[in-house]
């Protein structure tokens, strides 16, 4: 027996009833879906991962032009460079804080390299760094 006009209709489980406002709701939903679909179709660019691979490769070719390097070895060297960079930056930051300065200068970098790297390696790193800063300063003028 169909329900009378005065009686309440049983819930349809969240679904829209067959008559009334359903077509209008579908049109609105259709518009939203179309907008969302066009947003979904937009391709996301690959997130770029910054590495030192190209620079490591260039140095390798300067030193040993006929030698190659595996992906795993490149990954290890990249991790090594990141680790040393982080250690030097952290130490330079501490040195600047000790001296109540808000700027890290070449002096802090040089001191942190001397503290982090052992003996002869530190001497070579400092001399190469000084040479690089001098070259940069002369080319900037």
UniProtKB/Swiss-Prot annotation:
<keyword id="KW-0238">DNA-binding</keyword>
<dbReference type="GO" id="GO:0000786">
    <property type="term" value="C:nucleosome"/>
</dbReference>
<comment type="function">
    <text>Core component of nucleosome. Nucleosomes wrap and compact DNA into chromatin, limiting DNA accessibility to the cellular machineries which require DNA as a template. Histones thereby play a central role in transcription regulation, DNA repair, DNA replication and chromosomal stability. DNA accessibility is regulated via a complex set of post-translational modifications of histones, also called histone code, and nucleosome remodeling.</text>
</comment>
<keyword id="KW-0832">Ubl conjugation</keyword>
<dbReference type="InterPro" id="IPR007125">
    <property type="entry name" value="Histone_H2A/H2B/H3"/>
</dbReference>
<protein>
    <recommendedName>
        <fullName>Histone H2B</fullName>
    </recommendedName>
</protein>
<keyword id="KW-0007">Acetylation</keyword>
<feature type="compositionally biased region" description="Basic and acidic residues">
    <location>
        <begin position="1"/>
        <end position="10"/>
    </location>
</feature>
<keyword id="KW-1017">Isopeptide bond</keyword>
<feature type="modified residue" description="N6-acetyllysine; alternate">
    <location>
        <position position="8"/>
    </location>
</feature>
<dbReference type="InterPro" id="IPR055333">
    <property type="entry name" value="HISTONE_H2B_site"/>
</dbReference>
<feature type="cross-link" description="Glycyl lysine isopeptide (Lys-Gly) (interchain with G-Cter in SUMO); alternate">
    <location>
        <position position="26"/>
    </location>
</feature>
<dbReference type="GO" id="GO:0003677">
    <property type="term" value="F:DNA binding"/>
</dbReference>
<comment type="similarity">
    <text>Belongs to the histone H2B family.</text>
</comment>
<dbReference type="Pfam" id="PF00125">
    <property type="entry name" value="Histone"/>
</dbReference>
<feature type="modified residue" description="N6-acetyllysine; alternate">
    <location>
        <position position="9"/>
    </location>
</feature>
<feature type="cross-link" description="Glycyl lysine isopeptide (Lys-Gly) (interchain with G-Cter in ubiquitin)">
    <location>
        <position position="135"/>
    </location>
</feature>
<dbReference type="GO" id="GO:0046982">
    <property type="term" value="F:protein heterodimerization activity"/>
</dbReference>
<comment type="subunit">
    <text>The nucleosome is a histone octamer containing two molecules each of H2A, H2B, H3 and H4 assembled in one H3-H4 heterotetramer and two H2A-H2B heterodimers. The octamer wraps approximately 147 bp of DNA.</text>
</comment>
<dbReference type="GO" id="GO:0030527">
    <property type="term" value="F:structural constituent of chromatin"/>
</dbReference>
<feature type="cross-link" description="Glycyl lysine isopeptide (Lys-Gly) (interchain with G-Cter in SUMO)">
    <location>
        <position position="27"/>
    </location>
</feature>
<dbReference type="InterPro" id="IPR009072">
    <property type="entry name" value="Histone-fold"/>
</dbReference>
<feature type="cross-link" description="Glycyl lysine isopeptide (Lys-Gly) (interchain with G-Cter in SUMO); alternate">
    <location>
        <position position="9"/>
    </location>
</feature>
<keyword id="KW-0158">Chromosome</keyword>
<dbReference type="InterPro" id="IPR000558">
    <property type="entry name" value="Histone_H2B"/>
</dbReference>
<feature type="compositionally biased region" description="Low complexity">
    <location>
        <begin position="11"/>
        <end position="22"/>
    </location>
</feature>
<feature type="cross-link" description="Glycyl lysine isopeptide (Lys-Gly) (interchain with G-Cter in SUMO); alternate">
    <location>
        <position position="8"/>
    </location>
</feature>
<feature type="modified residue" description="N6-acetyllysine">
    <location>
        <position position="15"/>
    </location>
</feature>
<feature type="modified residue" description="N6-acetyllysine; alternate">
    <location>
        <position position="26"/>
    </location>
</feature>
<keyword id="KW-0544">Nucleosome core</keyword>
<dbReference type="GO" id="GO:0005634">
    <property type="term" value="C:nucleus"/>
</dbReference>
<keyword id="KW-0539">Nucleus</keyword>
<feature type="region of interest" description="Disordered">
    <location>
        <begin position="1"/>
        <end position="49"/>
    </location>
</feature>
